[in-house]
Design a protein with these regions (language model features):
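Long helical/loop segments within the catalytic core of UDP-sugar-dependent glycosyltransferases
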Residues: 1-66, 77-78, 99-138, 142
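Generic structural signal for helix capping and beta-alpha/helix-loop junctions
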Residues: 10, 93-94
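Conserved helix-loop functional segments at active or binding sites
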Residues: 24-27, 52, 89, 123, ...
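Catalytic donor-sugar/metal-binding loop of nucleotide-sugar-dependent glycosyltransferases
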Residues: 64, 73-92
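Conserved glycosyltransferase catalytic-site signature
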Residues: 66-71, 210
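Nucleotide-sugar-dependent glycosyltransferase catalytic core
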Residues: 94-111, 200-209, 234-252
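Loop-to-transmembrane boundary segments
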Residues: 126-149, 244-280
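Membrane-embedded multi-pass helical conduit in multi-pass membrane proteins
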Residues: 143-236, 242, 266-320
C-alpha cells in the first residue's frame, strides 16, 4: 500500500514550492491513474506498507540499483502481488531545501530508474502479463530518456532559429508547432493534480512555468545520470539531507551540517555555458523577430542559469 506524500515545508521557498507541484503531479495523477487502470505502480521508498511475505517472495531487497524500491515493486507485481495507492491518506515528508541536495536526489532517481529498466524490462517482456501492461511498464521505466532529449532540444533550438530565417523551411517549422500540445497536456496534468487536493490550486498552478524551467535546467544533471545508468557505471547512494524544516523561519544551516553538500561540481560550468548559449539564442530570436522562440529559450536560460547560481550559492553557504 502506497500513500500520497504531503509536504511539511512546501512553503519554505520557491524551490520547495516547485518540487511540491512536481510531486503532486506524480502522486495525484500518475500513481493514482496507473493504479486505477490496472498498470504497475512503484513504491516510493517511504509512506507505504509492505507485507513481509511479499518482499521475500519477490526476492527481497537487492542493492544492484539506486532505486531498490522501484526494482522490488516491479518484481513483486510480476509475481502477482497487487499494489494499492491511497490518494486520500497522506504521509508527511520534507522536501530538499538545498539545490545541490535536490540535484543528488534527482540524479539518484534518474540513474536508478535506468538501471531498473535494464534489469526488469527483460523480465517484463518474458512474463505472461497483458501486452498493455508490458508497453506501459516500458514507458514508465524508460521515461527518463526524455532528459537527453530535453538537453538536445535546447542546444538545437538556437541554430534552428538561424536556419528558419536563412532558407525556405516554413512548412517544416509549421508542422513542428504540433509539439506545443506536449506543453498543454503537461499543464493540464499538473493543474488537475493541484485542483484535486488544494482549495487554493489557482495560486499554486502559477508555478508551472517555474517547474518547466527547472525541469529544463535539470536536463544536464539528469542526462549524466541516464548515460551512467546505460553504461553500467556504479555510484554510491547519496542520501538526501533532512533538517526538520517546517516553516520559512527555520534556519537549516546550524542543523546537521555534516549532511550538507559543500563541493562545487564541475557540472556547474557546463550549466553556465548552456545558460549563455540559450541567452545568445534569445538575442538571435529577437533579431529575427522569432517571438515564439523567446519563451522557450528563456526557460532554458533561466533553468540552467538559476540552478547554476543557486548551486554555487548553496554550496558556499553550507561551508560557513
Amino acid at each position: 500500500m502506497q500513500t500520497r506524500w504531503e509536504h511539511l515545508n512546501d512553503e519554505f521557498s520557491l524551490l520547495t514550492r516547485a518540487q511540491a507541484l512536481a510531486l503532486d503531479g506524480h502522486f495525484v495523477m500518475e500513481q493514482q491513474v496507473r493504479n486505477k487502470a490496472g498498470f504497475f505502480i512503484n513504491f516510493n521508498g517511504t509512506a507505504g506498507i509492505w507485507r513481509k511475505s511479499c518482499i521475500l517472495d519477490a526476492g527481497n531487497w537487492q542493492p544492484d540499483t539506486l532505486t531498490e524500491d522501484l526494482d522490488l515493486s516491479y518484481r513483486a507485481q510480476l509475481k502477482g502481488w497487487k499494489f494499492i495507492f491511497i490518494n486520500d491518506f497522506t504521509s508527511p515528508s520534507e522536501l530538499p531545501i538545498e539545490i545541490n541536495a535536490l540535484k543528488n536526489q534527482q540524479f539518484r532517481w534518474t540513474k536508478g530508474a535506468i538501471e531498473t529498466a535494464k534489469k526488469i524490462l527483460p523480465l517484463v517482456w518474458k512474463s505472461s502479463i497483458p501486452l498493455k501492461i508490458k508497453l506501459y511498464s516500458t514507458f514508465h521505466l524508460t521515461m527518463n530518456i526524455v532528459f537527453p532529449l530535453i538537453m538536445i532540444a535546447g542546444l538545437l533550438a538556437v541554430p534552428l532559429v538561424y536556419v528558419k530565417n536563412t532558407g525556405n523551411y516554413d512548412e517544416y517549422f509549421a508542422f513542428m508547432s504540433i509539439f506545443t500540445l506536449a506543453f498543454i497536456s503537461s499543464f493540464l496534468m499538473y493543474m488537475y493534480s493541484q485542483k484535486d487536493v488544494y482549495p487554493d490550486w489557482k495560486r499554486r498552478i502559477y508555478l508551472f512555468p517555474v517547474f518547466m524551467a527547472g525541469s529544463m535546467g535539470f536536463a544536464l544533471n539528469n542526462t549524466k545520470a541516464v548515460i551512467e545508468g546505460l553504461l553500467n557505471k556504479k555510484s554510491e547512494f547519496v542520501r538526501t539531507p533532512k533538517f526538520r524544516i517546517e516553516s520559512d523561519t527555520d534556519n537549516p544551516h546550524p542543523k546537521k551540517k555534516k549532511y550538507a553538500v559543500t563541493k562545487i561540481s564541475p557540472m556547474i560550468i557546463l550549466e553556465l555555458i548552456f545558460a549563455l548559449w540559450a541567452l545568445f539564442g534569445i538575442g538571435l530570436a529577437a533579431y529575427y523577430t522569432e517571438i515564439a522562440a523567446i519563451p522557450f529559450l528563456s526557460m532554458y536560460f533561466l533553468g540552467y542559469g538559476v540552478i547554476a547560481v543557486m548551486s554555487i550559492k548553496h554550496a558556499l553557504e553550507s561551508k560557513k
